Regions:
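Residues lining hydrophobic/aromatic ligand-binding pockets adjacent to catalytic sites
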Residues: 1-234
């Protein structure tokens, strides 16, 4: 059984979804520290002028360093109306926009105060749209261990997994002999974001999964699987 861990994200790009497709169990790492540089609260779409970020405004006490689970959405800003207006304007001509539109609008407009709640709804939509069968567990339900290797061992044991999908560069941060002694193997994902049809000329990589879904529809699931390769990292 393969374990993966990743912070929850707001309609993440295909490369991030590849980890969900490759793992048997995914830990939604809500206890990780929030970073504005990550895709936790934002996603990139394609407009007539190129890439545009849609960001969910957040508030939290004592950050930077605040856990994702402790952040709330700032409803003093009309972000939901803006996100939906921008999506509808730029994708209404896409072949499958209206196939997903109702569900996506409901997620965006139905957001409560909790950022994690919004991300959980977005994650459920992503997994359902791609027919992913990985079991998702919140990190809040697992042992809290500060040290990286110890946390991985505790999570692998709790989830019944014997392999772990590493992030790029993560192997150098882990105690590899300790993992080997515990019978935990390491894998890595090789994902190639092959060009697919988009609104406009050329191809922009790294956009939200919404871009892939609106343009390719149910074929997005096959696209993702066809471009994933899992190789041993140990």
């Amino acid at each position: 059984m393969i374990l993966a861990a990743a912070p929850p994200a707001y309609f993440p790009p295909p490369a991030a979804c590849a980890k969900l497709a490759a793992a048997d169990v995914v830990v939604s790492a809500e206890s990780f520290r929030f970073s504005r540089k990550e895709g936790t609260h934002r996603t990139a779409i394609r407009t007539m002028t190129g890439r545009r970020w849609l960001s969910v405004p957040v508030v939290g006490s004592g950050w930077p360093g605040t856990r994702i689970s402790d952040l709330a959405i700032d409803f003093n800003q009309p972000w939901a109306d803006e996100h939906w207006r921008v999506l509808e304007y730029n994708y209404h001509n896409a072949a499958y926009f209206y196939y997903y539109a109702e569900a996506v609008e409901r997620i965006i407009r139905g957001a409560g105060q909790s950022l994690v709640g919004l991300l959980a709804d977005a994650g459920q939509f992503v997994r359902g749209s791609l027919a992913l069968r990985a079991r998702v567990i919140s990190s809040s339900l697992l042992p809290e261990v500060a040290e990286r290797t110890g946390r991985l061992l505790a999570w692998a044991e709790a989830c019944g997994c014997d392999r772990y999908l590493i992030h790029p560069g993560e192997a150098g941060l882990l105690d590899l002999p300790r993992l080997e002694a515990a019978g935990i193997g390491l894998d890595r994902i090789e994902f190639t974001e092959a060009p697919y049809h988009q609104q406009g000329p050329g191809f922009l990589p790294g956009l939200s999964l919404l871009d892939l879904l609106f343009n390719e529809g149910p074929a997005a699931a096959g696209y993702l699987q066809a471009n994933i390769r899992i190789v041993p990292a140990d």
